[in-house]
């Protein structure tokens, strides 16, 4: 491969990638440096008129190198599957999302039970799960770092391939210019000489030399076209290399962002969430204790008030209530009255019985007198 510097500060391939207009005639002879023009002249001398075998070999080494380069590019693309990198990043995002700080909200309707009993996701469970996920994230981070190292190496390799492609492009351009220069020389100098010689000569071989030269110029033109096709391949390969580099660079940046930003931020936010949750539970526990204390004080005050009122009321009462005395006196009076009535009734009954007994006694006496009288007369 011919070593030469770029034709200009801004390389044609870079212009092509930047969407600047570029064609096979972009690099003209007048844009060549003196050194490059010397290279073109040297290459042009390699083309010997009517040397068809030499013409066939002209630039073939460059085309073979381009073919090898294309195979190298194909192997690079086939061997570097970015799928596992995407899977690793997806796995990382899945792990980061598996622990949700919102799950740390353990508020319940009750008071002390809400604070001290087991909630749907206790802090210990969340913390344990976070530690497990953190360990998995650390392992994924190691994998991502390896991927990033490989991507960085691939980017450097692609830079080397890009530089090689630029060199192929430059060498092909020099060969194309040299061939075009030789073609113009043959068309403007050699062919007219042969044509003039054939016109002035009656030798049939002179006419054949004109035909052979014309065919050689046609083959040279075809060879220029083949080299231009190879040059076009180099031209199209440049943005392909850059696209692969851009994808690798984007993945490397994504990995770096995940390692240096996303993962530390996730760990910080989880630590903050756990700290805030502990603070919230501490405040809630303190609030519950305070509320319970206030409730107890209020209940005790109400009980004390009720006891004081009842005690004072009882102290102001006599040993026996007035109503009880009235009711008792009324019962005694009623008992006495009923007793007197019963006694009066008994007295009356006894008097009546006494009268009846006297009558009975009188009747008995009369009956006995009557019985004794007849007995005496007998």
UniProtKB/Swiss-Prot annotation:
Family membership noted in the UniProt record: Belongs to the TelA family.
Protein name: TelA-like protein SAOUHSC_01408
Note: Disruption of this gene leads to an increase in hla (alpha-hemolysin) transcription and proteases production.
Source organism of the structure: Staphylococcus aureus (strain NCTC 8325 / PS 47)
Domain of life assignment: Bacteria
InterPro entries, sorted: Toxic_anion-R_TelA
């Amino acid at each position: 491969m011919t070593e030469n510097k770029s034709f200009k500060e801004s390389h044609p391939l870079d212009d092509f990638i930047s969407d600047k207009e570029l064609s096979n005639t972009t690099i003209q002879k007048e844009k060549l440096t003196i050194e490059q023009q010397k290279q073109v002249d040297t290459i042009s001398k390699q083309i010997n008129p009517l040397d068809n075998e030499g013409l066939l070999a002209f630039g073939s080494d460059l085309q073979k190198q381009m073919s090898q380069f294309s195979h190298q590019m194909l192997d690079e693309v086939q061997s570097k599957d970015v799928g596992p990198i995407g899977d690793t990043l997806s796995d990382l995002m899945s792990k980061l999302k598996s622990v949700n700080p919102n799950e740390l909200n353990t508020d319940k309707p009750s008071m002390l039970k809400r604070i001290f009993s087991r909630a749907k996701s206790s802090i210990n469970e969340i913390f344990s799960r976070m530690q497990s996920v953190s360990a998995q994230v650390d392992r994924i981070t190691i994998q991502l770092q390896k991927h990033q190292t490989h991507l960085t190496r691939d980017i450097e390799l692609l830079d080397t391939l890009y530089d090689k492609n630029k060199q192929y492009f430059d060498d092909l351009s020099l060969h194309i210019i040299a061939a075009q220069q030789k073609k113009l020389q043959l068309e403007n100098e050699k062919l007219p000489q042969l044509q003039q010689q054939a016109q002035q000569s009656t030798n049939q071989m002179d006419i054949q030399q004109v035909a052979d030269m014309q065919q050689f110029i046609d083959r040279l033109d075809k060879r220029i076209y083949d080299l231009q096709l190879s040059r076009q391949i180099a031209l199209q390969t440049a943005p392909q290399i850059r696209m692969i580099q851009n994808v690798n660079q984007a993945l490397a940046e994504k990995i770096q962002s995940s390692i240096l930003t996303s993962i530390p931020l996730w760990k910080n936010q989880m630590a903050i969430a756990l700290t805030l949750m502990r603070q919230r539970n501490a405040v809630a526990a303190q609030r519950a204790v305070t509320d319970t204390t206030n409730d107890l004080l209020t209940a005790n005050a109400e009980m004390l008030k009720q006891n004081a009122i009842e005690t004072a009321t009882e102290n102001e009462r006599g040993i026996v209530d007035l109503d009880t005395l009235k009711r008792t006196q009324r019962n005694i009076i009623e008992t006495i009255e009923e007793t007197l009535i019963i006694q009066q009734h008994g007295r009356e009954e006894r008097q009546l019985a006494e009268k009846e007994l006297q009558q009975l006694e009188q009747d008995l006496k009369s009956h006995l007198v009557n019985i004794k009288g007849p007995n005496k007369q007998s």
